Amino acid sequence: MGQSTTYRLFRQAILERKQITCIYNGKHRELCPIVLGYKDGQEKCLAYQFAGESRSTLPRGGEWRCLELAKVRSVQLRDGPWHEGRQHRKTQACVDIVDLDVNIPATLRR
């Protein structure tokens, strides 16, 4: 599968532990990408949104988001603290074919 420019930027952000600012569904988001890959042939990312806007209320401290990368615009990488939430109780269902996962070091060496 050929990777989009957005996918490559999210990949770089994971490898370099950079924050991302972007527009998703018309809302400004500030997030850290955690799991990157594909589901149903679509480029997807499980990310932790820690600031910015949302269609729903963003809880204090942030929230997990499943992003369809085709809907992401205006991606910028920046330095800053890495955020990934405190709870990892549920198995993620956002990405079926995992390319990178910050929690699985072997994927970071590909």
Regions flagged by a language model, labelled:
Residues 1-110:
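Short glycine- and basic-residue-enriched patches
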